Regions:
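Short, charged low-complexity linear segments at domain edges
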Residues: 1-15, 126-128, 167-186
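Conserved alpha-helical substructure of the radical SAM core
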Residues: 1-104, 109, 220-238
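General alpha-helical segment detector with a strong preference for membrane-spanning helices
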Residues: 31, 78, 122-125, 162
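A short acidic, often aromatic-flanked loop/helix-cap motif at beta-alpha or helix-coil junctions
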Residues: 52, 121-129
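A short acidic (Asp/Glu
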Residues: 79-82, 111-112, 165-166, 211
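Histidine-centered beta-alpha loop that forms part of the nucleotide-sugar donor binding/catalytic region
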Residues: 104-105, 120-121, 166
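Accessory C-terminal segments flanking Radical SAM cores
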Residues: 133-238
Length: 238
């Protein structure tokens, strides 16, 4: 894989946007879910300690996040969602310019704070192929990583800091290594080392933009051999 081909300004933006997956549990089974909620189901929830560490490190390092998403799975299924929001509020006070947002298919079970954008009425029926391993279809791994990195930024989950929002499912499907455990060690180099491991399994690597590229040639329910074997293994142990 070639080096990250973004300008210094674009690299800065990538490293200052993040989605926090607070749960892997979902009450939908959308086909080709990039979080793996259809074929690689999991009920794992992030701990409050993990959220507290994220906030403490961000403040200690004076890390100026531009955007923080509270995601899943389905975030409203986390039984401590209100406590998570209370912890994140400390960072909101530290950096009021940071844009917090969340997306849900449910009704928020409490009065939602105005400092978090609550995205409702999302079309959950639209998905395209995801479970297509580039190595299965002889797609060359000779370009920079896909648009997801600079559109969505990093991911933070119970696995640590990860290079993109699709990373969690790769870890549990293929039993890959965890992410970076401390924010002070998050940089372009550490994220690209993880991309070398994760991207070879990801169908979105074959996208040029959100709706263009080689991946769009496959039906939305298509699953390549590497993913089928991973799914069979996963179902045997869960």
């Amino acid at each position: 894989m070639r080096p990250f081909e973004l300008s210094s300004d674009e690299q800065f933006t990538y490293l200052h946007k993040i989605e926090i997956d607070i749960t892997e549990k979902c009450n939908l089974s959308c086909k080709s879910c990039v979080r793996g909620c259809d074929n690689f189901k999991s009920d794992v929830m992030i701990s409050l300690d993990k959220i507290q560490r994220f906030v403490d490190e961000s403040i200690e390092l004076n890390y100026q996040w531009e955007r923080i998403g509270i995601m899943g799975g389905e975030p409203t299924l986390h039984p401590q969602l209100s406590e998570i929001i209370n912890i994140l509020y400390d960072y909101h006070q530290f950096n009021p310019s940071c844009h917090f947002w969340t997306r849900s298919n449910c009704i928020i079970p409490f009065d939602f704070p105005s400092w978090i954008e609550y995205q409702k009425n999302i079309d959950h029926s639209y998905h395209h192929a995801f479970y297509v391993s580039p190595q299965d279809v002889n797609y060359p791994m000779n370009k920079r990583t896909c648009h997801v990195l600079y559109d969505c930024g990093l991911m933070y989950s119970h696995h640590g800091y990860l290079p993109c929002c699709n990373s969690n499912v790769h870890i549990r499907a293929f039993n890959l290594i965890d992410g970076i455990q401390s924010l002070k060690n998050v940089n372009i180099e550490s994220m690209m080392r993880l991309c070398e491991i994760y991207c070879k399994h990801c169908g979105w690597y074959m996208m040029d933009d959100f709706e263009s590229g080689h991946l769009m040639e496959y039906p939305d329910t298509y699953m390549s051999e590497t993913w089928r074997k991973a799914m069979d293994r996963y179902k045997l142990v869960t």
